[in-house]
Amino acid sequence: MKGHVARKRFGQNFLVDQGIIAAIISAVDPKRDETVVEIGPGLGAITEPLMARVDHLHVIEIDRDLIARLKKQHTPERMTVHEGDALAFDFASIGKNLRLVGNLPYNISTPLLFHLAEYVDVVHDMHFMLQKEVVERMVAEPGNADFGRMSVMLQYRFYLEWLIDVPPESFDPPPKVQSAVVRLIPKPVSELNAKSQEKLSQVALTAFSQRRKMLRNTMKTLLSDAAFTELGIDPTCRPEDVSVEDYVRIANYLS
């Protein structure tokens, strides 16, 4: 890639497939006056078509070389460059009704998704390019081997939609993995039934800490067989066979 060498420590793989870029922009369908935030703009594959559709774009970038390039190419009137790590960024500082977009660095995608889940109150929606394996875990249903803590926590908080599959040759350099684009829309408060999201997270973390064992064994410090009976949940189930709704019921029972 002319002028910039992709840095492994930042997980940089730059999107170059114009067809995929167009499909992402079409899926996002940004409007002029919306607050759009791009995480990791890189060399601008998504940035440029986004800027053609919005009055002002916020970008979050950690690579100093790319920050300098962005500031040289765009005026502050059109673009606000937030310098730093998206994992530590306060998204609420930008405003509300944020539309987040990004080809997320695959080496930090999981912790970044959990970080972003803390800002659902200020987010309208999110469209992200991720490792396909991560998207499979996000949308997995109970009974599927991919169903885990991430599935529980993200499905509790968001409506998820798998939009586009993206092959390695769509990037420069090509990653060694398949990719996919996913849409996340925060659920309304009326659909969030957990008394404590922290307790739900603790329950999911405990349950999936030994995912091949029965719930009775993984959760013995939290629930007795009598409690499982009271909840109507089979204690001999494995963690991946329990629905999001049942994890919420367990968390509420313990809250």
From Swiss-Prot:
Gene3D superfamilies per record: Ribosomal RNA adenine dimethylase-like, domain 2 (1.10.8.100), Vaccinia Virus protein VP39 (3.40.50.150)
Keyword Transferase: yes
First and last residue of the signal peptide: none
Localization, UniProt: Cytoplasm
Enzyme class: transferase
Coarse class of the protein's main subcellular location: cytoplasm
Official protein name in the record: Ribosomal RNA small subunit methyltransferase A
Species annotation: Dechloromonas aromatica (strain RCB)
The encoding gene: rsmA
